[in-house]
Amino acid sequence: MTANAELLQGSLFGDLEPQANAESCSETITRALRNDLSDQELVDESLKRPRNRHKPTSVPSIPLDSESQEQLETADNDNDLPAWAHHTLVDPEQLTPMLRHYVELKAKHPERILLYRLGDFFECFFEDAIQLSRLLELTLTGKEGGKGIGRVPMAGVPHHAAERYCTELIRHGLSVAICDQLETTPSKGALLKRDITRVLTPGTVLAEGMLTARRNNWLAAVVVEPAQGNQPFCWGLANADVSTGEFLVTQREGSAELHQHLAQLEASELIMAQKIGESSRPAWCPEQLFLTTMATTPFSQPEAERTLLNHYRLSTLDGLGLQEVPLALRAAGGLLTYLRDTQPLAENVDEGIAPMPLEHPLTVFAGDALVLDAQTRRNLELTSTQRDGQFQGSLLWAVDRTLTAMGARCLRRWIEAPLLDSKAIRARQAVVNHLVETRSLRHSLRRLLRPMGDLERLAGRAGAGHAGARELVAIADGIERLPRLAEQLHNALRSAPNWLDNLLTLDKSLPKLAASIREQLINNPPLSLSEGGLMHDNVDPLLDGLRNQLDDQDTWLAGQEVQERKLSGNPNLRLQYHRTFGYFLAVSKAKASMVPDHWIRRQTLANEERFITPDLKTREGQIFQLRARACQREYELFCQLREQVGKQATSIRKAARAVAGLDALVGLAEVAATGDYCCPEIDNSRELQLKTCRHPVVEQLLVERSFIPNDVELGKDIDLVVLTGPNASGKSCYLRQIGLIQLLAQVGSWVPAKQARVGIADRIFTRVGAVDDLAAGQSTFMVEMAETANILHHASDRSLVLLDEIGRGTATFDGLSIAWAVSEHLARDLRSRTVFATHYHELNGLSQELTNVANSQVLVEETGDDLVFLHQVAAGGANRSYGIEAARLAGVPDDVVQRARQVLAQLHDDDSSLPALLSAKTIKRQS
């Protein structure tokens, strides 16, 4: 920057420097300046005057004055605009050209809120304006619609806050179509060019503010084939996270399993084909899912195959391995079509860059992971609590020590789909073991991971053409940390999981990409991409030439300010810039009458007058043209850089997945090292042996007392344990901690115990508590029986079954009979590893009939009327439930408690010895 330019900058933000050299400024004024130089002339000029690298100077400006703010006309209420409450009620030919264009676009997206860019606002009209104003509590205004039309409803949001408002609309279950400006200056006599650039739906959003950082945002598509004759109900599902690039497909049977899978996935949006006349929400679709329907054509086999071939630029689909899952293939085709339709102006599609860069679809088979149905996930509180749906108090809350968003998502996926392969489990264990033993390495890795950005999603935004300059800088920062992470691992880990290879053998092009970003972008670029100030000097000769010309204009402005001070005799005169009024000369009210004749009054304020001169007005136009060319050139250079980064999205994501997995393992090691965990012995046996094990969540929630550990032994000699004990003694907690330890072991984590041997389970079943399902017309007892039936139909000898009461919601004899029969079937026929907590003490008799059944009880200490829960599990069955004592502790009135004791004593006198009636020796099993 020249001395005179610095002088002008100082005057814009304070007083004029007293040592200003008026003569040098005068020389500058007379110098001829051109703003019509060709690109080549500008390049040549930049070579003659090379620039020193520095952050480009932003255009000086002053805040908007309150009296210059545009005031919107506000309708008194909705009834002021009764005739035009819907866009279909108006004749498009009578509308203004802009509103006619709006209506044309709205007709293509009738089910979406259309946000139409007008200057600094995104506006809605007609029914969208009314809905927007009500949902977001915005002022409903009006806009002139045309001759014979009058005012039509209008509501809008500032463009810089559009993301926040769109997030709210999506949370209300709506989708949004964004119509943006495609040019900055319209052609002569034409409207500014605008078109739909993006469609935002719950499953397709990419903006950081619309996503939950520590969980995936799944978009799913499903194709079903109903049962016909001997053919079962079949379905194919494709689910993608467009923000991370993950793309999974699966194909299975059974409507109940589809419902379970969708409930487990917790997709943000589900797409399905719908024929005319079909119900909008099938019975297998969970109520909470955001459902979007499409035409059936994209889901047909030929169309889906064409879509996949075009999207991935392939000549054959053989390499994708989808031949054996045709329904999943069709679902994948429908999903990709939907993504294409929601990104109508995605950049560079013709050059082979996908609008939403997704990995090749990965087929997931039914036997790849431990099966956890929706009921088990709720009962074990894997990612949220059962009572109020909170994250705190869940298993993930207890064991998540990840430092990156991608690591947190990885750990969540691991917990939702534990491994079945003992080799893969041991590979994770090996890394965790080494990190636990090597504290310095663990802490060093955590220091490197802590500031790491979300490379997965950043790469996705770059690949889709949505990343800003700051996001590219964050990508460069993340890439620069990868070699240091790899170096730490190379030196420490002799054997590591295969997926860490993407980090250990880093793609050599990535460091070069980071260097390119650093070379071009300044370290802290502005949020806006259209106002310049993004790129370093010496990046592009044309940009340097334009900046040289702008510096010359700044020098002219500084000289003009000095000259006008001399001519006016006013040393306090200031030359300033206003984003609405442009450049002007500002003087106080007292000096306004003394200005030269060639000054033209531009604006009057309370304390000052603002003027322009013919020379200043002419020069203003030249500056605006130069500035527009410079900003446009910077944007072009930035888009080229973003495209360069987008082409490397796959490589970045591969490295990011490795970092995410490493972060998850480092976090598990931190939990193990600080939580007194042990490394479980994993094998393919049916045994589950836990010494002094603890509940991983409850022990962290206890503040005033320590958790009481207990032992567990199943699968060797004993397959079923009948667990009895008082109410509120900890039976349910004991069941859950067994299930959580089994799950953690199959994740590859250490477990809260002194010693553990864990045989791999194929499924974990839980039936803990029940509530009415009034919507489905089912009572508590029917819900309980349905859950029990599901367990009995699907459990195997390798399953872990955890039951907390069966048969409570019916008559005592009926309930006890059901509980006995279920327990007997699990132990004798299925031989599943089972713990059955019950208040039917008669079930203790089952151990006398079956050698693989044992009794355990939760101990209590009774002193007079006082009852102390010891929370210790010991061998042997309890003969009392202490329900009346528990009722007293809960605050039941004393007279009711005393009456309950009288009734209990009478019932004991009339007892008919139920165990004898239910003895297997006296009940014949009928074939």
Curated annotation (Swiss-Prot):
Residue span of region Disordered: 44-80
Supply the alphabetized keyword list: ATP-binding, DNA damage, DNA repair, DNA-binding, Nucleotide-binding
Q: Which NCBIfam families match?
A: mutS1, PRK05399.1
Family statement = Belongs to the DNA mismatch repair MutS family.
What HAMAP family does this protein map onto?
Answer: MutS
- Residue ranges, compositional bias (Acidic residues): 67-79
**UniProt-listed SMART domains:** MUTSac (SM00534), MUTSd (SM00533)
Functionally, this protein is described as follows: This protein is involved in the repair of mismatches in DNA. It is possible that it carries out the mismatch recognition step. This protein has a weak ATPase activity.
Q: Name one GO molecular function term.
A: ATP binding
Source species, please? Prochlorococcus marinus (strain MIT 9303)
Q: Name one GO cellular component term.
A: cytosol
Gene for this chain: mutS
What residues bind ATP, as annotated?
G725, P726, N727, A728, S729, G730, K731, S732
- In Swiss-Prot or TrEMBL terms, this protein is called DNA mismatch repair protein MutS
Per its UniProt record, what Pfam families does this chain match? MutS_I (PF01624), MutS_II (PF05188), MutS_III (PF05192), MutS_IV (PF05190), MutS_V (PF00488)
InterPro entries in the record, alphabetically? DNA_mismatch_repair_MutS, DNA_mismatch_repair_MutS-lik_N, DNA_mismatch_repair_MutS/MSH, DNA_mismatch_repair_MutS_C, DNA_mismatch_repair_MutS_clamp, DNA_mismatch_repair_MutS_core, DNA_mismatch_repair_MutS_N, DNA_mismatch_repair_MutS_sf
Q: Where is the signal peptide?
A: none
Give the GO terms filed under biological process for this record: mismatch repair
Zinc as a keyword of this entry, yes or no, is: no
